[in-house]
From Swiss-Prot:
Location of this chain's protein in the cell: Cytoplasm; Nucleus membrane
Membrane topology designation: Multi-pass membrane protein
Any Gene Ontology CC annotation: cytosol
Keywords (A to Z) from UniProt: Cytoplasm, Membrane, Nucleus, Transmembrane, Transmembrane helix
Ranges that cross the membrane: 30-50, 69-89
Keyword Calcium: no
Name listed for the protein in its UniProt record: Putative uncharacterized membrane protein C191.04c
Source organism phylogeny: Eukaryota, Fungi, Dikarya, Ascomycota, Taphrinomycotina
UniProt source species: Schizosaccharomyces pombe (strain 972 / ATCC 24843) (Fission yeast)
Amino acid sequence: MHSVCSIFLSCSHRVIQAKHPPFPLFHSYFHIPDFLSFVFPFVASPPLAFARRKLDHVPKKFARSIGPFLLIVFLFFNLFPTFFFLPFFPDTTKRPNLAD
């Protein structure tokens, strides 16, 4: 599930990035979501599996709330930089009207 979500978010982020390329100042910053969306499933899976085995004494209510929390954090890191800075970038898909 995490890998499907990360692939979808990574692709959607790249589509938006293609229409609104970042300024050089933010260029390295805008690759953070791509990096996180690729690394997240691999990094998060072993610790979560380990925690699930070792923390049997943790109440199930708390254990159920960790998954949605991680998903929210994951979505925040993927979508927030894109949509927060989007209005500040020029839309390079518009071509000048040569008839004027």
